[in-house]
């Protein structure tokens, strides 16, 4: 387990689309561990593999209710809309209001290859959507409807 440098705005890897994990190996377990260590050290509530330079569809989230690890996550259902404040470990100092689905169902694999289906709302739903966006090269600044702090250089 290790703490990695978090890539910041302007690094082209943050805009790349991540590849699905085809086989869960010890390297994927190590990636999950490193993501969690890096997220907690930052500290943050979520981190996606591209943020540490790995273009794989892997995320971790912990909004205070325990660690969620997901491999190849996808939103399979979404309802309602809430606008809420977001920031990002890859864009230090920037915060903005972002519209997101109020309730989502996310499907992915756990570290043992078992299918997990999570119904989430509130901050948990927001964090899952934010991290899944990272896997497609989408940053929260692409969706901001109102800035709360300093505006970053890229839109």
Curated annotation (Swiss-Prot):
What catalytic activity does the UniProt entry give for this protein?
A: N-terminal N-formyl-L-methionyl-[peptide] + H2O = N-terminal L-methionyl-[peptide] + formate
Which EC number(s) does UniProt give? 3.5.1.88
* Cofactor(s) annotated in UniProt: Fe(2+)
What UniProt keywords are attached to this protein's entry? Hydrolase, Iron, Metal-binding, Protein biosynthesis
Tell me how the cofactor is bound. Answer: Binds 1 Fe(2+) ion.
Q: Which family does it belong to?
A: Belongs to the polypeptide deformylase family.
Q: What does this protein do?
A: Removes the formyl group from the N-terminal Met of newly synthesized proteins. Requires at least a dipeptide for an efficient rate of reaction. N-terminal L-methionine is a prerequisite for activity but the enzyme has broad specificity at other positions.
The protein depicted here goes by the name: Peptide deformylase
> Native species of this protein?
Moorella thermoacetica (strain ATCC 39073 / JCM 9320)
